[in-house]
Design a protein with these regions (language model features):
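N-terminal pre-Walker A segment at the start of P-loop NTPase domains
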Residues: 1-14
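Hydrophobic anchor at the beta1->P-loop junction of P-loop NTPases
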Residues: 25
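Conserved lysine of the Walker
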Residues: 33
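Hydrophobic positions on the alpha1 helix immediately C-terminal to the Walker A/P-loop
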Residues: 36
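Conserved nucleotide-sensing/catalytic segment adjacent to the nucleotide-binding pocket
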Residues: 59-101
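Short regulatory helix/loop adjacent to the ATP-binding pocket of P-loop NTPases
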Residues: 108-123, 140
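Domain-level recognition of nuclease-like catalytic cores that cleave nucleotide substrates
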Residues: 139, 365-387
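Accessory nucleic acid-recognition modules appended to NTPase machines
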Residues: 161-327
Length: 387
């Protein structure tokens, strides 16, 4: 794989494979799961359940299917045949030296229950699109608008596709496969409207009642549809931070898309240059930085730990990352020009939050950086230095 872009999660997965008989990787379509597992376990026999003949064999004779070899087996698209999990459990219980790698394009029921079905036997990981650190040297990171517009899906970063072709096909496949076939959502027109309205609310508090009124469905339906977007890895809900805080807090999560390029497509942004005129540019930039923090946690095999802060007095900090009992507090600004006003929330945060704060930083798009003061000033290209 000469054009393979190495992923930061590789070391974590290889370490886990020393202790688990099963490695499972889930994530959105086209995030590089199959490529990653093929790279990490090249000697495993690979079977893709996209192949209808292979799928039919797996369903009709799972024991024979799983015992075609005594070597490792990599099963791609495991969610297409969830009954295999019980048989895999039996195999690794009887022979812990047998090894399986599994990938799934969603965290629908099969992936959500996988860690329960194979408790103590499986290392379960999530792979999102590429991080900025992963594509350093592979794409032009100086052109912020281009990064936001293109997004960070592997096929785009590896220059095997371009955004204007990739995202229309991606959304069409998502609507036709995941939404219709797997989730039985009949009203695709309203669901598509809902999807676009979600993109218009990047970085905003999620309000099911308000969104339902715009789409023309109940808040209960909106909540269900939102769970669909989460289950298929299109969006992330960022929870508010609430520990050691005496003030009244906002309880609603913030909504972000898992890739800025997908958000741009849903917002009808047709060129990178259009972003300079678009009111959503700041929110899309914030979206990218928030997802960098979440990807960093996933790549270390960790869940949670990423929050925002907002209280009833409208005091707000864009991003809080909890590590080893301390917080990193980050304000995100899309501007290239530094302003002292960027520091306001970070200078006051100790009055709002009692948890120790180890690092404060402003992440922006300007080139000047300063890491010698109380508040670090960081260009987005170097976000990994404070994660």
């Amino acid at each position: 794989m000469t054009d393979y872009i190495h992923r930061k999660i590789e070391e974590t997965i290889l370490e886990a494979s020393k202790y688990f008989s099963v490695i499972a990787v889930s994530g959105p379509r086209q995030s590089g799961k199959s490529t990653l597992l093929t790279q990490l376990f090249p000697l495993y026999e690979k079977y893709s359940l996209k192949d209808l003949n292979i799928l039919d064999y797996a369903k009709n004779d799972p024991i024979a299917f799983l015992n075609q070899t005594d070597e490792g087996i990599f099963i791609d698209e495991i969610q297409r045949c969830p009954q295999l999990l019980d048989y895999i459990q039996g195999i690794v219980d009887n022979n812990p030296k047998r090894h399986f790698a599994l990938s799934g394009s969603s965290n629908f029921e099969v992936m959500k229950n996988l860690s329960e079905s194979l408790a103590g036997r499986a290392g379960v990981f999530e792979l999102l699109p590429m991080s900025i650190q992963e594509v350093t040297g592979k794409v032009d990171l100086d052109n912020l608008n281009q990064i936001l517009y293109n997004g960070l899906y592997p096929s785009i970063c590896a220059k095997k596709n371009i955004a204007k072709f990739f995202y229309p096909s991606y959304v069409k496949t998502y609507l036709e496969k995941d939404v219709r076939d797997l989730l039985q959502i009949k009203d695709q027109i309203r669901f598509t409207k809902f999807l676009k309205l979600c993109a218009a609310r990047i970085g905003s508090l999620f309000n099911a009642t308000e969104l339902g009124a715009e789409v023309g469905v109940s808040s209960k339906t909106i909540s269900h549809w939102l769970s669909v977007l989460q289950a298929s890895y299109l969006i992330t809900l960022l929870p508010p931070y609430y520990e050691n805080i005496p003030k009244r807090l906002v309880k609603s999560p913030k909504l972000y898309f898992n890739d800025p390029g997908l958000a741009c497509y849903l917002l009808d942004i047709e060129t990178p240059q259009q972003l300079d005129r678009d009111k959503m540019r700041g929110a899309i930039f914030e979206n990218m930085i928030v997802m960098e923090a979440i990807k960093h946690r996933y790549n270390m095999g960790l869940e949670g730990g990423v929050f925002f802060y907002r209280d009833s007095n409208q005091n707000e900090v864009d991003l809080l990352i909890k590590q080893e009992g301390e917080l990193t507090a980050i304000e995100v600004k899309s501007s290239m020009t530094y302003s002292s006003s960027f520091e306001k929330a970070l200078t006051q945060i100790e009055g709002w939050i009692k948890t120790p704060i180890s690092t404060k930083a402003i992440v922006y798009s300007g080139d000047f950086e300063n890491t010698s003061g109380n508040i670090n000033l960081i260009n987005y290209r170097h976000i990994s230095s404070i994660l």
